[in-house]
């Protein structure tokens, strides 16, 4: 049936868990339609930035000092001392909430991703769409992205990226919080600690341990 063919294998592959261990909202995110509309989302206005996301992020940050490759704590220690405790009125923290508190209550769990790129100089069109998802459990990747279709590229050759779900460990990039019963209970304990941090706002997928779409 539809669930077995399109939902079960893909979901368990992405999350590394049996569907019965996952919250219902994960399944409810999958739209079921009886129309020929092939858009995943139903927002009235949809699109991607001309020139890609790098350009729009650069414009958003224009004139704002940005430091990369520096740990949050070392940055705060460098800029905020006992003699000058109020350098920042508020700090927006979008990293992992358990890492912020040095994992003192235990580790929250996340899913990570691994990307595999391939350039095909003799292939002008690999799959005909920007993104194709693979729902079969036995296929190790969840989707293939063909980049030229995002902006109607017409150049010779094509580049594809295969996206593989992966277990997360410290040092890996955390992409998705795993909102099962155990993790939600632990997050609530961390949230109680966060409420005592008067100068810090916790936001984003990692700071609020919640699956947000990027437009949220």
Name the predicted role of every residue range.
Residues 1-90:
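Active-site/ligand-binding neighborhood in enzyme catalytic cores
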Residues 69-71, 147, 203:
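Conserved beta-strand termini and adjacent loop/short-helix elements that scaffold enzyme active sites
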Residues 73-193:
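Mid-domain catalytic core of redox enzymes
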Residues 78, 211-212:
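Active-site-proximal flexible loops/turns
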Residues 195-210:
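Short FAD-binding loop at a beta-strand-to-alpha-helix junction that anchors the flavin cofactor
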Residues 215-216:
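An active-site-proximal "capping" alpha-helix that borders the catalytic cofactor pocket
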């Amino acid at each position: 049936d539809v669930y077995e063919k399109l939902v079960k294998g893909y979901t368990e592959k992405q999350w590394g868990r049996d569907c019965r261990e996952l919250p219902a909202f994960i399944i409810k995110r999958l739209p079921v339609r009886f129309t020929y509309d092939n858009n995943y989302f139903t927002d009235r206005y949809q699109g991607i930035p001309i020139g890609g996301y790098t350009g729009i992020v650069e414009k958003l940050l224009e004139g704002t000092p940005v430091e990369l490759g520096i740990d949050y704590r070392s940055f705060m220690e460098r800029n905020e001392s006992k003699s000058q405790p109020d350098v920042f009125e508020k700090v927006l923290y979008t990293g992992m909430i358990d890492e912020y508190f040095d994992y003192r209550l235990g580790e929250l769990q996340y899913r990570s991703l691994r990307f595999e790129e391939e350039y095909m100089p003799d292939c002008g069109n690999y799959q005909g769409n920007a993104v194709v998802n693979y729902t079969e459990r036995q296929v190790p990747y969840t989707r293939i992205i063909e980049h030229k279709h995002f902006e109607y590229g017409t150049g010779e050759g094509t580049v594809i990226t295969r996206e593989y779900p992966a277990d997360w460990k410290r040092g890996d990039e955390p992409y998705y919080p795993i909102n099962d019963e155990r993790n939600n209970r632990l997050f609530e304990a961390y949230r109680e600690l966060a409420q005592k941090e008067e100068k810090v706002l916790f936001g984003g997928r990692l700071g609020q341990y919640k699956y947000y779409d990027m437009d949220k």
